[in-house]
Amino acid sequence: MTIAQLTCESDTVANQEVLLSIITVVRNDAQRLLKTIDSLVEFYGDERFEHVVIDGKSSDQTLDLLQTNSRHKNFQYLSESDNGIYDGMNKGAGRASGQFLLFLNCGDRMAASPDQLDELLRPVAQTDEADIVCFCSRVYHGAHAGVLRPQSGRLHKMPTSHQAMVFSKEFMRTHLYDTRYRIAADFNLYLSANAARVLVLTGSEPLTDIEAVGVASENPWQSYKEYLQIAAEKLHGSTKWMALARIGCKAAAVILLKKTLPKGWLNALGRRA
């Protein structure tokens, strides 16, 4: 998918004032998708929001669930083969009509209410002060949860979880997820932004409830390999070398602790790379 295709697709969406498009990518995961859909009940029918689901041509009950949920006017889905998670996310961005985009993983849940989101995002939309807005998220390790607060000025890792980052539509018109990366394309996208236009809301309530287990935490070696490659390509000078050193040290620590820590703790380390 190209930038031109994304722009063209978004222009075909009905011209309406949608504040936030929530994008979910799924393939053969109906049970966890239902958790995400259930968390958005308050958002369905609210014209300030829309939910866009990109399905990778599922063969389970996912399509039945999507067809049932399509009764909501602000819900849409596309089911076709894709080239992985980030290709699906790019497709979702192309179909979205909101001023802001949130990529909510299948199985993760929205924690904020529609009015809370409106209160936080409306001023940003009116002032055009940010390309990326970073919120808190609540991370679940089984039955236990902890709040992950965003941090600014960190170039060796994500400022917060990807599911707690809201992107402006204008930013996504000119930046897509690089599908060369299987796990860390979100980190690549973050480093593509102007640091001065990344807004960090440290005092916010959690935007999303997310699972500690994910693609990155289940494949830490591939994750760190991609992080190192991206930092080497995107950063320069002393900033690059500091980032590479920190990523390398984190990777080494995970390797050493892999066989001694419970799986949930290792997943927590992998969540923030």
How would you label these PLM feature ranges?
Residues 135, 142-230:
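Conserved nucleotide-sugar donor-binding catalytic segment
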Residues 48-57, 78-81:
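Short beta-strand/loop segment that forms part of the nucleotide-sugar
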Residues 18-21, 50, 188:
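Cell-envelope/extracellular polymer assembly enzymes that use nucleotide-activated donors
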